[in-house]
């Protein structure tokens, strides 16, 4: 079993290991293809394959989990109140802040320049295996990226929102920003979305199981990020939009691949 390494950072001191849309762009769904699973001992702890609601989620390869790009729990040194979510879009982390002074930190992917929510919001409700529909603004500004998906994509392995989604509201109104899972593994730790906050599917499932709605959310400003975590400020890179052929996500072949597997047909060791 691979154990986390090179994770400690001053801004999130005294770390210890954990116990184990909207305005969101569609991404290539690695889960549609039949996954080739490495040997069990090659999975990083907490990031192996998961069978969830009949869907077979593949594990996350170790190359995407280097350094700080994995989930850990330790002392919280940020400025958000207990029982809240603290998002640092510059260091590319999300913290679940707990009442005992600790937090679980998750690596995230965030919006490209100028495409992110800032300030305070409320996570009003949560959904498992959510569907996704591009907003009118997305269709208007980037029709070449989103036009083929204007009718939406139902929840499941094809959905760009992944295994779970948390819906952000402000002043009682939907912001159309989400905190959600993704199959676009290279985007975690980078800026590449249309504004939403992405987590590995294993991480969004872990977070979903720890929280309840409603919950306050703080999205840090540049000054807050520099003050709390200067070492990781502005880590990662900006990625271009991912162009996807419509047949990857819609059509008979995609629909067939999206169906949950027959649980009775699963062989031992498959997950």
Residue ranges with predicted function:
Residues 2-197, 201-271:
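N-terminal pre-domains immediately preceding structured catalytic cores
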């Amino acid at each position: 079993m691979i154990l986390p390494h090179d994770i400690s950072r001053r801004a999130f001191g005294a770390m210890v290991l954990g116990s184990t849309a909207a305005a969101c762009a569609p991404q290539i769904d690695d889960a549609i293809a039949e996954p080739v699973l490495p040997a069990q001992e090659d999975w990083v702890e907490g990031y192996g394959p998961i069978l969830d609601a009949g869907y077979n989620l593949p594990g996350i390869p170790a190359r995407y989990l280097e350094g700080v790009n994995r989930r850990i729990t330790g002392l919280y040194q940020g400025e958000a109140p207990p029982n809240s979510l603290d998002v640092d879009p510059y260091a590319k982390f999300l913290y679940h802040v707990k009442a005992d002074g600790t937090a679980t930190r998750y690596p995230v992917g965030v919006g490209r320049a100028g495409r992110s929510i800032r300030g305070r919001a409320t996570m009003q409700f949560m959904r498992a295996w959510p569907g996704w529909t591009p907003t009118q603004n997305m269709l208007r500004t980037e029709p070449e990226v989103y036009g083929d998906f204007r009718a939406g994509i139902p929840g499941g392995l094809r959905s760009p929102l992944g295994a779970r989604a948390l819906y952000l509201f402000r002043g009682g109104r939907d912001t159309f920003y989400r905190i959600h899972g993704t199959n676009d593994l290279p985007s975690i730790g980078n800026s590449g979305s249309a504004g939403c906050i992405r987590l590995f599917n294993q991480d969004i499932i872990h977070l979903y199981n720890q929280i309840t709605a409603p919950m306050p959310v703080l999205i840090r400003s540049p000054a807050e990020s520099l003050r709390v975590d200067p070492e990781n400020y502005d880590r990662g890179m900006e990625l271009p939009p991912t162009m996807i052929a419509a047949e990857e996500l819609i059509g008979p072949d995609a629909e067939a691949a999206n169906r949950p597997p027959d649980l009775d047909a699963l062989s031992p060791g498959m997950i």
